[in-house]
Amino acid sequence: MPGFTDISWIAALIFTTDWVIRLGFALRVVMRRRSVGASLSWIGVIVLLPFVGAIIYLILGENRIGRLRGERFERIRPQLERYLDGLNEQAAADPQSLAPAQRALARHSTNRYGFPLLGGSSVELLPDADAIFARLVRDIDEAERTVHLAYYIWWNGGRVEGVIEALLRARQRGVTCRVLADAVGSKQFLRSGVCRRLRASGVEVVEVLPVGVWRMLFRRQDLRNHRKIAVIDGEIGYTGSMNMADPKTFKHEVGVGQWLDAMVRVTGPAVQALGLVFLSDFDTETDEAFGDFEAEGGLHDIQPTGSVVTQLLPSGPGFAREAIRETLLTAIFGAQ
């Protein structure tokens, strides 16, 4: 065509490619069936930022955890579901003991998460770091079979050293010790001599969701494992808001004061549910292919220790998407 230069062809190609990418990614956003606000926000980013918007969406727009990790969880799902069915038969709570709004919430949670409503547990609130560290170290020192710890942040120093020494003592007694530490939140710990010392003693320390430029192409790097769980001998469990970090020493240079956290110490059937979450995470991350959660995870039939009704609501890969948000909305709508 007269007057149509090579530069014009290049410009036309770039223009066409740009709009094909924008429209294609906008259609993908719509097909993901997010909330209206989230969908419009992502479409705005894609349309208003040529090429860059699509790259941002690829990195942050979808909950991609990696194909292999997803396949590993699907492999253990049947075993997990069988164990949950058995747990339900053994320790199911009577929904009629709950208020109507609580029954509706429990029914919704069971359908979305698959974890049953359990009775017969005891729950002790540990309101500060002093109580948490003291009880945890004591329980680890009394462990006979397994110590399982999963934390988003593991930060060396302060009273965390007491936990580390307790783990080393447990290994000397022949106790199986496993630690899950998030690659981002626990970077300081995972690169430290303390971690190497634990591994040398036989503690299985696993870096959860490793990060890297290459991995960015296949998995979102901002999706982290934020669990704070401890399960000891399949009989004692801890969960709550405190990471494995001493508030007196953790990032004190920031100058914002000590973090205020709390945990609960649980005994009874609820501990088995916590143990299952840890084991499913550990198996998914390591591909160890546990043949039997009960035998290798230290789980066993637990007699009632109290009268508290509990239900575990786990999030993360393999579990229902948006389930936590839906549960909170269900609770709010049922408020009286």
Q: Residue spans of the language-model regions?
A:
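N-terminal localization/anchoring segments of enzymes in phospholipid and broader phosphate metabolism
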Residues: 1-334
